[in-house]
């Protein structure tokens, strides 16, 4: 009797002519996707490639999709611009990026009650709201308006927001794995947004970068 042995599937990087055209950024050790090229800054076992997503990517104009779940908030805002630029330059025309990141509106609505100053829960609430900003390696939390403007300023087109797991693009549906909290006053616990590469040039928005420097980064770097 002949025994059939299943050969392991060969995985080619996006640089290869037959390579995978879907890249997941910041996947960590547990969110590995079979049909995606899984990347992280750290060389975890079973990921496809360790890479700094804020540095130039080696796959210009090749990718169908880029996906990053709860990754953007771990970057300083200037690093986030670098990441979005490099992802956009790596997408082919019509390719899409999908991001999920905590909603700063939801954090403010759910973490502090604005009761009288002597309210007994204020100690815990104050700790919790700071935890949302600084815990788990967080560097920056986004409002819907800022996230939309940032994507558009970098050069993405057709910027849209979606509910958890939903998309107009079949290949981008059902990707989210992080738990989602209840919406409060219309604000979800995380913003899930997509943008497409189109005719608008992808690049670093000088005016927005100057705003970030003036209103935030200069003060963060100044220390006391």
Predicted feature residues:
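S-adenosyl-L-methionine-dependent methyltransferase catalytic module, highlighting the catalytic core
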Residues: 79-82, 86-224
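A broad, low-specificity signal for short, low-complexity segments enriched in glycine/proline
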Residues: 1-2, 8-12, 26-30, 58, ...
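A generic short-segment signal for beta-strand/edge and adjacent turn/coil regions
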Residues: 4-8, 17-19, 37, 67-68, ...
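Membrane-proximal basic amphipathic "stem/tether" segments
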Residues: 1-19, 213-224
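Conserved SAM-binding loop
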Residues: 20-107, 193-197
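Proteins with a high burden of low-complexity, intrinsically disordered sequence enriched in S/T/G/P/A and R
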Residues: 2, 42-46, 51-55, 126, ...
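Short secondary-structure boundary/capping segments
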Residues: 14, 40, 183-184
């Amino acid at each position: 009797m002949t025994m059939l042995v299943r050969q392991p599937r060969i995985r080619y990087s996006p640089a290869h002519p037959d390579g995978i055209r879907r890249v997941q950024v910041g996947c960590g050790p547990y969110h590995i996707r079979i049909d995606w090229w899984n990347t992280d800054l750290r060389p975890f076992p079973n990921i496809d490639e360790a890479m700094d997503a804020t540095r130039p990517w080696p796959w210009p104009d090749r990718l169908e999709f880029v996906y990053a779940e709860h990754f953007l908030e771990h970057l300083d805002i200037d690093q986030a611009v670098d990441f979005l630029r490099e992802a956009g330059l790596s997408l082919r025309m019509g390719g899409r990026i999908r991001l999920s990141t905590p909603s700063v509106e939801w954090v403010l609505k759910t973490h502090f009650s604005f009761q009288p100053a002597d309210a007994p829960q204020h100690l815990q609430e104050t700790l919790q709201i700071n935890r949302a900003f600084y815990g788990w390696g967080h560097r920056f939390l986004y409002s819907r308006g800022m996230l939309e403007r940032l994507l558009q300023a970098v050069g993405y087109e057709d910027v849209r927001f979606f509910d958890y797991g939903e998309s107009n693009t079949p290949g981008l549906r059902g990707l989210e794995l992080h738990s989602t909290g209840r919406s409060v006053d219309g604000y979800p616990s995380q913003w899930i947004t997509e943008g497409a590469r189109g005719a608008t040039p992808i690049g670093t928005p000088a005016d927005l970068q100057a705003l970030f420097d003036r209103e935030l980064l200069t003060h963060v770097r100044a220390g006391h």
